[in-house]
Amino acid sequence: MKRMFSVFLLITVWLLVTPFLQAQSHVDKVLKDEITSDLKENILSFWERYSVDSSGGFYGSLGRDGAPIADTPKGGVLNARILWTFSTAYRMYGDTAYRKLADRAQRYFIDHFIDSQYGGVYWLIKADGTPLDTNKQTYGCSYAIYGLSEHFRATGNNESLQRAIELYRIMESKVKDPVNDGYIESFTREWGTPQKLGYDGDGIAAKTMNTHIHVLEAYTALYKVWKDNGLRKRLAKVIDLITTKLYNPQTHHLISYCDSNWNNLDDIDSYGHDIETSWLLTEAAETLGNPEVIGKCRKVALELADASLKEGINPMGAMMYERHKDKIRRDASWWCQAETVVGCINAWQLTGEQSYLESAVRTWNFIKSRMIDKEHGEWFRTVLEDGTPRYKEPKASMWNCPYHNSRMGFEIVARLK
């Protein structure tokens, strides 16, 4: 009798669960298919078609329609992100057109952005490839390591690995704070103290959350291809700094700006950075492979994701930009939306909770309806609170790049197999 009851119970559970799993599988497939189509046919194709500068490298700025904006300086961050994007595209899809663009980006970056005399990375070069702003920003150096590490991973080009290692060693010898640890924000070309902090000269902080999360992703990418014990220790330390010095366990938000002693300098909750960090921390911990660190990072990751989703999502399903003191910046930036989709899928995979998958779909639906430029391709940079895009913003600039939204595509393809 007990056996018959057990069989009956199993059949009942199967009948109840199977439709749910089938529906969930359908949602997964639709999400993956739609995002893959956007990645290959809208984002990557736009950059293939418009970004290549016939005089060398890639244009510094493109208008909404892809037309180059003449004589625009070329940013190190933009070019490192282009390098990362097409290296990843080649690794995932094996398309030789992606390989060609990845190699072009690698060669141009090494030849024009890396300072052969003092080490590190120039912040800006002129349209003709000569140095313009030679200050060293830790943010830019981190992206160089990220892009070069991915190029080696995708192509096996040893020069890329060696350059990434050189930059890592510069970070440890010149940038790391020898007293309080962490990474100082800005330097002169010769690694002296700059007159002004930050990449815009308006910075208030010796150390920032934004730079540290990109040191995290850079060191994670490098450790995937170079299992150096010293790097392993530093990656573990960066994880520790983010989860102890830059994370507020009371608010479940990251601390944006600190002095050299890690004292908080402002009152900001950056929703996009919080949910981006949630999955970057998870990836870093899993790459490190320490079970204790993985457990700690998963806990923090879910707290970051929950807080940003609770406080930062607007009625249209878009992630708003940030809260600064008593004011909320309510516009929706392209990068925040991309990171929200990945962060939600990561949280769903960690917990199995359907609400995270639903949040990912909701934000993707906002991207489809409001953020993708159906006339000229790629995404709008900003959508205002009323749902109107800022039509005149450039598609490429120092900050506009194919990295956040293409990475969303790569992550979804890899995660929803």
Report residues per predicted region.
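Bacterial Sec-dependent N-terminal signal peptides
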Residues: 1-26
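Glycan-recognition and catalytic cores of secretory/periplasmic carbohydrate-active enzymes
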Residues: 24-417
